[in-house]
């Protein structure tokens, strides 16, 4: 017989009755019934009930003292449970093991939190003792699901002719939109590597190298703040690139992968392919977001022209100063109490709005609300037609500069969807957001900057860049850039790449980069493009976010084995941490006085 186990804890069935077995695992639960002690033994695979009887008093007494989460090896005989003790919630629920011997392989200390329930413990405690947290069923299953998803992705990609690669982790800094994690070089004092924010340049270089279809389950590193759907520090993406493709080719390649993946790992309804295509400007108008949740049926409308000549002075004056007005319908909300409308106004103000106007349309067509009395019958009819409002509905209004008004309307739309329970249940709604602006104004400097990926191809190519003589014209340029969105979560950005050096130099010069700086920062790729680069494009869906959706987790840390906390700290391994002066000296690094003072405190 094996030293530790003949079976796992999910394996034994009624057909095994009478068999002598050996099992190893963790003490999940213990119940003392006087003349019987029951232990639920748990391993990676499941749970089985172990029984200790008073036929062996010493063994039963020893079992009654076992601490939860101690690791034990048990030898015994499989017996059938009586009819009234069968547990149909367990695969092993028709049998139990009558113990004749057990060995404590490793005794557990007092637990910092309970393992055998899903009751929440403080997150910092969970992360500090992640090895315990990972034993909990839900989190344990999430990590198994993650492995299964990645394995299936590999199968799907290889079936489509993609080759898996590994690209460097130590590389050069690249403007991907976030801060780099820098790694000092001992051999080259004063110089630094950067951990890749994405394998962007390398995957493009592989296309130039003659490989046709690349993919990688790629680790990416970005020094950015945490969010519910974004883990600080490190994340993984399904990174892919293809040669000789158009935007539609990329869509038609990744859509069946997403459809197959979500259908395999969920029973929920998944959007049929092809997924809906929504241009960026249309998305910002209709949904107030570039990552719309299409489960929400509310459509935002622009009603600026209706209010331009109205008697509602506040909106009329805002419009005269360059603002717009957006209408957000609230279906069947006309009869909601005043507290509902007050609550919505408070929410809008908390999001930065100056206020939130509204009108209620009764089932008979009568209006209620401060805004209504300033609109003529013709204007009210026009409003109902433009915003698709029916009797029995309400409608909210925001007025501000275009970008802010769009964002505020989007926030109100999301909140209304939640408050009115409008989201379609049990479904995954996919869409593509296309035609992103190539440039944007940097909020801090007021200068032209890339809006997303600087390596994307501008629509219209070099001619479009050269003909855009004003800031306004530059901001109207679009890129062959796209996002795939599911249930309001951006899963990925992608683009058809700029593979022509002359267009790249021009695009970067508009964003304030000299040719010398471009050569210095992207010399390897620019040089490669001068030796025959194929048209190419790609995308990189986020693995963590995909798993988060399929696991129905509310926080991305629930699908990562060892995540950082919201302050980008690893509480288990105590990172980041100060290092010895000797190590800093080898790297030619000197701490600032304030940092040195903090280091001495530790």
Curated annotation (Swiss-Prot):
Locations listed in the record: Cytoplasm
GO cellular component, one term: cytoplasm
A GO term for molecular function: aspartate-tRNA(Asn) ligase activity
List of residues binding ATP: 222-224, 490, 542-545
Region (Aspartate): 200-203
Stored Pfam families: GAD, tRNA-synt_2, tRNA_anti-codon
Primary enzyme class: ligase
Reactions the enzyme catalyzes: tRNA(Asx) + L-aspartate + ATP = L-aspartyl-tRNA(Asx) + AMP + diphosphate
Enzyme Commission no: 6.1.1.23
Family matches, as InterPro entries: Aa-tRNA-synt_II, aa-tRNA-synth_II, aa-tRNA-synth_II/BPL/LPL, Asp-tRNA-ligase_1, Asp-tRNA-ligase_1_N, Asp/Asn-tRNA-synth_IIb, AspRS_core, GAD-like_sf
Broad class of the protein's primary localization: cytoplasm
Domain of life: Bacteria
Keyword Protein biosynthesis assigned: yes
Binding site for L-aspartate: 176, 222, 452, 497
Site feature Important for tRNA non-discrimination, where: 33
A single BP term in Gene Ontology: aspartyl-tRNA aminoacylation
Keyword terms, alphabetized: Aminoacyl-tRNA synthetase, ATP-binding, Cytoplasm, Ligase, Nucleotide-binding, Protein biosynthesis
Functional note: Aspartyl-tRNA synthetase with relaxed tRNA specificity since it is able to aspartylate not only its cognate tRNA(Asp) but also tRNA(Asn). Reaction proceeds in two steps: L-aspartate is first activated by ATP to form Asp-AMP and then transferred to the acceptor end of tRNA(Asp/Asn).
Subunit organization: Homodimer.
The family this protein is said to belong to: Belongs to the class-II aminoacyl-tRNA synthetase family. Type 1 subfamily.
Full protein name: Aspartate--tRNA(Asp/Asn) ligase
Organism: Rickettsia akari (strain Hartford)
